[in-house]
Amino acid sequence: MTKGTITSHDISDFKGGWFIGDFNPSLLKTKDFEVSVKTHPKGEIWDKHYHKIATEYNYVMEGAVEIDGVIYKKGDLFVIHPEFVVDPNFLEDCSIMCVKTPSVVGDKYVVKRWRS
């Protein structure tokens, strides 16, 4: 009889908070989806970007973020569909859990910011 185990991992051992998906290192290597937990300080400048294929399911665990004029706060869920350009404004220190499907390496397209 084999007994189960629990393994412990440090999120800092994974690239950018992404710990499940079709990349290394990964706790579960799969092309089906990706999972991350990220913490963003208030005012952090994040890449303005979009995904051609993937859909992101996001849950705000702490803080507040504004995307496209809508403020998402602790407890809010929001879905970002393919080809929607995201330019987040972190209004407070913010922690977000993201599930992205499918897991497609290279499916992030950065959009240049134009200054007036």
What are these model-predicted stretches?
Residues 45-47, 66, 78-87, 105:
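Histidine-centered metal-chelating micro-motifs
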Residues 39-40, 50-66, 99:
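Short, conserved beta-strand element in jelly-roll/cupin
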Residues 31-33, 41-44, 64, 102-104:
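Short, charged/polar surface micro-motifs in flexible loops or helix N-caps
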Residues 1-34, 47, 113-116:
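A short, N-terminal "cap"/entry segment at the start of jelly-roll beta-barrel domains
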Residues 26-29, 37-38, 46-52, 68-70, ...:
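Short histidine-centered beta-strand/loop micro-motifs
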Residues 71, 82-112:
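Ligand-binding loop in jelly-roll beta-barrel domains
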